Amino acid sequence: MAGNTGERPFVDIITSVRYWVIHALTIPALFLAGWLFVSTGLAYDIFGTPRPNEYFTAERQELPIVSDRFNALEQLEKLTR
């Protein structure tokens, strides 16, 4: 038999005006913040990932794949030059 936890039912929450007043501002603000985070390039700087135009340089057009695990450091040095 299911008991009562004393919490407010979910249907009551999402049909309340207070919920939508709060979330009508916060949900679009989160999307806007995420878009700005990526479009300004800050995400690339913080996480250290290369930007789309930095994956391949003019000198190196092949995929930078490490194929030999025992000589991985040598391969990485050669790939990052």
Swiss-Prot record:
The chain crosses the membrane at residues 21-35. One of its GO terms (molecular function) is iron ion binding. PROSITE patterns: CYTOCHROME_B559. Keywords: Electron transport, Heme, Iron, Membrane, Metal-binding, Photosynthesis, Photosystem II, Thylakoid, Transmembrane, Transmembrane helix, Transport. It is found in: Cellular thylakoid membrane. Heme binds at residue 23. It comes from the Bacteria. Belongs to the PsbE/PsbF family. Heterodimer of an alpha subunit and a beta subunit. PSII is composed of 1 copy each of membrane proteins PsbA, PsbB, PsbC, PsbD, PsbE, PsbF, PsbH, PsbI, PsbJ, PsbK, PsbL, PsbM, PsbT, PsbX, PsbY, PsbZ, Psb30/Ycf12, peripheral proteins PsbO, CyanoQ (PsbQ), PsbU, PsbV and a large number of cofactors. It forms dimeric complexes. This b-type cytochrome is tightly associated with the reaction center of photosystem II (PSII). PSII is a light-driven water:plastoquinone oxidoreductase that uses light energy to abstract electrons from H(2)O, generating O(2) and a proton gradient subsequently used for ATP formation. It consists of a core antenna complex that captures photons, and an electron transfer chain that converts photonic excitation into a charge separation. This is Cytochrome b559 subunit alpha. The lineage of its organism: Bacteria, Bacillati, Cyanobacteriota, Cyanophyceae, Synechococcales. The gene is psbE.
